[in-house]
């Protein structure tokens, strides 16, 4: 799992030879970008992107705002896990998740930490049947180093590294690699 509030994603593999990807967009997107993502879903059946639309986090009071944020966080996490479960066909399940980076500040960091906690709890309950021995949490720099990128690499660097030198050879011919090669500019600039 690569978690973010606006675009969390997961890679699913049973054998490190075949891969499926799921993602949830959780922000307002232009009609043209929505159409673009729908096209990706059609062109690459092993990639499944769900759009939740624009978040509504503003309430009339502090309590109302926090309730709306929590509703949005629960919808985001449950939609992501529901989508993953449609692609998982074997047990036991092993889950790797990227730990959060501390680049965010203030309330956005609090929201990321809170939502990541909800995600971990949901993974425990719904994917791992509360058996946490199947959960592995990696620091962002560990994951970047594992693919051959620098620990402080940004998303563009990670995309480039994945396209140019995937560490799992089968990933070179995966739907995600083909999609990134074909639509890299559209994906990283939107």
What are these regions (language model features)?
Residues 1-190:
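Phosphate- and other anionic-substrate recognition elements at nucleic-acid/protein interfaces
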């Amino acid at each position: 799992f690569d978690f973010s509030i606006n675009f969390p994603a997961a890679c699913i593999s049973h054998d490190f030879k075949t891969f499926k990807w799921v993602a949830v967009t959780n922000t307002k997107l232009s009609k043209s970008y929505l159409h673009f993502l729908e096209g990706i879903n059609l062109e690459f059946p092993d990639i499944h992107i769900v759009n939740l639309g624009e978040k509504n986090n503003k309430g009339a009071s502090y309590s109302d705002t926090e309730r709306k944020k929590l509703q949005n966080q629960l919808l985001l996490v449950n939609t992501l896990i529901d989508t993953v479960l449609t692609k998982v066909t074997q047990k036991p399940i092993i889950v790797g998740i990227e730990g959060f980076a501390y680049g965010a500040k203030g309330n956005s960091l609090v929201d990321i930490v809170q939502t990541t906690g909800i995600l971990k709890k949901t993974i425990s309950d719904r994917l791992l049947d509360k058996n946490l021995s199947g959960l592995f949490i990696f620091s962002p720099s560990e994951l970047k180093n594992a693919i051959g990128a620098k620990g402080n690499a940004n998303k563009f660097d990670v995309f480039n590294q994945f396209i140019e030198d995937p560490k799992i050879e089968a990933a070179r011919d995966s739907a995600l690699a083909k999609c990134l090669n074909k639509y890299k500019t559209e994906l990283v600039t939107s």
